[in-house]
Amino acid sequence: MASVKVAVRVRPMNRREKDLEAKFIIQMEKSKTTITNLKIPEGGTGDSGRERTKTFTYDFSFYSADTKSPDYVSQEMVFKTLGTDVVKSAFEGYNACVFAYGQTGSGKSYTMMGNSGDSGLIPRICEALFSRINETTRWDEASFRTEVSYLEIYNERVRDLLRRKSSKTFNLRVREHPKEGPYVEDLSKHLVQNYSDVEELMDAGNINRTTAATGMNDVSSRSHAIFTIKFTQAKFDAEMPCETVSKIHLVDLAGSERADATGATGVRLKEGGNINKSLVTLGNVISALADLSQDAANPLVKKKQVFVPYRDSVLTWLLKDSLGGNSKTIMIATISPADVNYGETLSTLRYANRAKNIINKPTINEDANVKLIRELRAEIARLKTLLAQGNQIALLDSPTALSMEEKLHQNEARVQELTKEWTNKWNETQNILKEQTLALRKEGIGVVLDSELPHLIGIDDDLLSTGIILYHLKEGQTYVGREDASTEQDIVLHGLDLESEHCVFENAGGTVTLIPLRGSQCSVNGVQIVDATQLNQGAVILLGRTNMFRFNHPKEAAKLREKRKSGLLSSFSLSMTDLSKSCENLSAVMLYNPGLEFERQQREELEKLESKRKLIEEMEEKQKSDKAELERMQQEVETRRKETEIVQRQIRKQEESLKRRSFHIENKLKDLLAEKERFEEERLREQQGLEQQRRQEEESLFRIREELRKLQELNSHEQAEKVQIFQELDRLHQEQNAQSAKLRLEKRRLEEEEKEQVQRVAHLEEQLRKRQDTAPLLCPGEAQRAQEEKRELESIREALLQAKEMRAGGDHTCRDELERAQQYFLEFKRRQLVKLASLEKDLVQQKDLLSKEVQEEKVALEHVKCDAGGDPSFLATDDGNILGGPPDLDKIKTAETRLQSREHQLQDLLQNHLPALLEEKQRVLDALDSGVLGLDTTLCQVEKEVGEKEEQIAQYQANASQLQQLRATFEFTANVARQEEKVRRKEKEILESQEKQQREALEQAVAKLEQRRSALQRCSTLDLEIQEQRQKLGSLHTSEWSGWQASLETDGEALEMDPARLEHEIHQLKQKICEVDGVQRPHHGILEGQAVLSSLPPSGGNSHLAPLMDARISAYIEEEVQRRLHDLHRAIGDANHTPADVMKSNEELHNGTTQRKLKYERMYSRSLGTNRDDLKDPIKISIPRYVLCGQGKDEHFEFEVKISVLDETWTVFRRYSRFREMHKTLKLKYAELAALEFPPKKLFGNKDERVVAERRTHLEKYLREFFSVMLQSETSPLHINKVGLTLSKHTICEFSPFFKKGVFDYSSHGTG
């Protein structure tokens, strides 16, 4: 067992951190790493001091932040410290794993892969591995087989980096072998012979790896890469076979990243999410393994069941053996030294600290047969030791010695057999490894490659070519082309005039045909072909201008060899390309003259050979020239490529320079914009100051001009007053006459208003009488019947609840209790049906009686009208009214009133009482037809009926109280009318006396003025005194007259306001009567009553406004009476009242009036001061927080519900059960609420903070949707068209007691 080795490496600061002026927060001393939190002030003691610096101890701490530091650790030192252990473990037969962990841009890829000038761990480990392999192979100590694979995990999908592009790039699946563990299906494995092969594959994989630029790293790895080396070694150690298989996982992880720091969006954001998901799973695996290791270290502690979530991520699944399994694992935590990355760095250090506690179980992975051989040899040695220790003579004779010796021989034979089998298998493996799919055989000093399939052998005149290229032509079609073809080619070639899809070799039953594609250049034996051509043994094929091959057909060659042995063919013909022609004509020629023919053919063949040799030489020369041209062109391409690279590097440098310059320019632009904004603000402030100063100057100038104008007016006024004194006398006479006429008109108007008031009171009395006529239709026993039925239903409910409790307690007698309760309920329904039938019969009789009375009243009314029509004393006026004797007219009105009353009663009976009774009877019949129901159903039905009975009883009580209130209101209105009449009579007397006094005073004043004016005219010496007296007299008259005029205007306004006020009060009383009329309807007409009420105006449509209406009427009447009495006293001019007394009485009167107004405004402002625009969103509700209440078993959470209705706001505290009760109750009344999603009840976790926080959000959403539905529902009392401007806190509380603030709701410690 071995723990995971953990190393921490800190990188230098990058350009981004330097631009942010980040501080260095990492210190390393030997194996200790310390991180400092600069946000906590230095010098703190206690917890704050400990929180400022945190120190961790690891196996290794690599300080690579400063190359000039003596403690600087280079790539080479990291390899010597960690990489040599990996190579050593691999040669010992252990699995090994190295992975780097850290945030994005912390140096993971640099540590693992390095760069072109400074290789990382992966290249150095591979190089060291093959260096040791070569050293071992040189001394023939062992043989090795090495396979590599390279994959990446991108967006939780596995991709093979060493496979050429195809449609299955990301479709590799991860599976798990029961013994070998997780593996990737169809992952390509590549045999390598040396480090250059590994380096080539590694470079190819790195090119295919997914990288992108983010806000924190220009070349950020967007995937996890795993480079795996499967290393097999076999050798004989002291004649003991030894075979071990090691897997080395070299992992380069992508970095964890925050979206706000990297600025990732779109694809980058999705990649970052998948990267973080796999890294979080890796952290969870590390934590779980650390917990398991700690439990294993403490055997006395009870072990916990810890689940390790390997399969939550593809990364952790593939590294299952490396984390807590059969592997020697090294974790390298890479961190940033900057304070801007403090959180990520601390998280990385904590994960690394947890990883130290993981315990792995590495074992040597040896072959099963080798292990068995080793165990058998150990057993043989033990048996030989036993035989050598005992008495040889005694043991040889005993049966035990014979059995031991026999077992010894069996084991030795088995060891030899297994050793031979293992040696043959390994040698065969090595031969297959060397020979691949070809058969090698030695012929003299040469080596012959044999193959059974048709194949092509490359003819290459490249001076640097040292190998032989052989391509098999499989059964079917073999495609030849370039690497950039749209489809994958079986044979990939390069050269001049070679098309991307050049040709096809078709092998059909041993016959091979060459098919050129789209006019490609193909030659067979020097002849250009354009159509499909069959190939024969030895054919020379030229594809393009530089790719030449020889076609070999083993089966055809074997047939030709057989024919040559039989003497049918010459030895020369087998080596030339015109073999087919010779085969066709040879038989006939040989039969004609075999000897001469042979000599002739030999000469022809020699000539042909010579010509072909020359042709080949020419072709070779041409090929050399073409090759030289190709090399020249390649050199030119290489030169241009290098120049392109130089230009690209310059472009990158220029781009970086442009980026830096643009960054500086942006910063300068930002500074300039900020300076411009400051300048604009200062300029605006200066402009505002100047504007304010200009306004002040204009105001002062305006005031000066006004003062000047006033002075001028005053001067002119003083001049004009002298002239107006004499004109005032004439005007006083005229105004006296006009005022007298106005007072007479006021008297006449008061008399008319008195008549109208009397008529209104009579009309109100008539409406009250109609309402009283309708009231007898209500059966007096209805309330008593409802009370009795409620008591019976409550007893049934108690019985059902008792049966339910007995059933929950497991009592076996609960069934009998349930049956008795249900039978009692059915008996109650039967009695109720009998009562309803009796009521129905009474109502039918009452309907017949009312119908009969209506007919009689109609007949009587007709008789009265006929009698009145024949009387000549009745005269018809222009407007159609009948004027006659008062007794006859009273009879007609009385008869019409009785007829309307009876018709109204009959209509109310037919439309409301009778249908409601039939509906209730039908419900009882349905309940009886359904028979005995379940406990819960019966209990629910009983609960519903109890609620209905309670509503009926409350409705009856409200009807009675409202009828009584209506009567009291009528009496009060009649009293008010009588008081108004007295006030008007008193006002008439006051006006008459006032007019008389005013007339006398004016006459005396005019007489005095006339006398004094005549005296002034006679005596010129007294002009100044007369002028002064005139001014005094004029001022006196002016003040007196203005006082009288103001008094008269006040009286006139009061008199003008009286009809409007009285008319408004009568209108309010009418609305109230209509409201009471709607509420007085019986319980089975509730819905119809609500519909009628909803059609009334908003100001009088709700019954809860009745107290406000009474208070308003009382306040206005009291105010008017007090004002008129005060005016009366002031008009009389009581001599006993001093000015101080008058002011005191006025103040008292004003205070009383003000108090009454304030009282009324407080009571009625909510229903009158609302704007229509506020009804767009009248109710706002939220749950800002929740509190923990109670102790022990009663501990629970309560939610603070904040309700705002227009300008009223209040708060209640409710627990979750109250929400659920309200939802269940209102859902039965309003079907629309059933569609709302209510947060479900949970059996566990009700006291968990996360559950409560989530429930708070759901409840808040539910309440908002709840009010939205109720405001739009036609059946809801909160419908916006019904409540209108009267929507208030009172309306919401009446709708449901859930929103009513109770006694314990004034703090957060209520019971909810």
Curated annotation (Swiss-Prot):
It comes from the Eukaryota. Residues 1177-1291 form the PX domain. Residues 3-358 form the Kinesin motor domain. One of its GO terms (molecular function) is small GTPase binding. GO terms for cellular component: cytosol; early endosome; early endosome membrane; endosome; microtubule; phagocytic vesicle; spindle. The modification Phosphothreonine is found at residue 577. Residues 366-425, 835-913, 941-1073 form a coiled coil. GO terms for biological process: cellular response to type II interferon; early endosome to late endosome transport; endoderm development; epidermal growth factor receptor signaling pathway; fibroblast growth factor receptor signaling pathway; formation of primary germ layer; Golgi to endosome transport; microtubule-based movement. Gene3D superfamilies: 2.60.200.20, Kinesin motor domain, Phox-like domain. InterPro entries: FHA_dom, Kinesin_motor_CS, Kinesin_motor_dom, Kinesin_motor_dom_sf, P-loop_NTPase, PX_dom, PX_dom_sf, SMAD_FHA_dom_sf. Transmembrane segments: none annotated. It is found in: Cytoplasm, Cytoskeleton; Early endosome membrane; Cytoplasm; Cytoplasm, Cytoskeleton, Spindle. Disruption phenotype: Embryonic death. Embryos are arrested at the blastocyst stage: the primitive endoderm and epiblast cannot be distinguished and appear as cell clumps resembling the inner cell mass (ICM) of the blastocyst. Embryos do not develop an epiblast epithelium and the uterine reaction appears to be incomplete. Development of the primitive endoderm and a basement membrane derived from it are severely affected in embryos at 4.5 dpc. SMART domains: KISc, PX. Keywords: ATP-binding, Coiled coil, Cytoplasm, Cytoskeleton, Endosome, Lipid-binding, Membrane, Microtubule, Motor protein, Nucleotide-binding, Phosphoprotein, Transport. ATP binds at residues 102-109. CDD domains: KISc_KIF1A_KIF1B, PX_KIF16B_SNX23. Pfam families: FHA, Kinesin, PX. Interacts with PTPN21. Interacts with RAB14. Belongs to the TRAFAC class myosin-kinesin ATPase superfamily. Kinesin family. The PX domain mediates binding to phosphatidylinositol 3-phosphate (PtdIns(3)P), phosphatidylinositol 3,4-bisphosphate (PtdIns(3,4)P2), phosphatidylinositol 3,5-bisphosphate (PtdIns(3,5)P2) and phosphatidylinositol 3,4,5-trisphosphate (PtdIns(3,4,5)P3). Does not bind phosphatidylinositol 4,5-bisphosphate (PtdIns(4,5)P2). Plus end-directed microtubule-dependent motor protein involved in endosome transport and receptor recycling and degradation. Regulates the plus end motility of early endosomes and the balance between recycling and degradation of receptors such as EGF receptor (EGFR) and FGF receptor (FGFR). Regulates the Golgi to endosome transport of FGFR-containing vesicles during early development, a key process for developing basement membrane and epiblast and primitive endoderm lineages during early postimplantation development. This is Kinesin-like protein KIF16B. It comes from Mus musculus (Mouse). The gene is Kif16b.
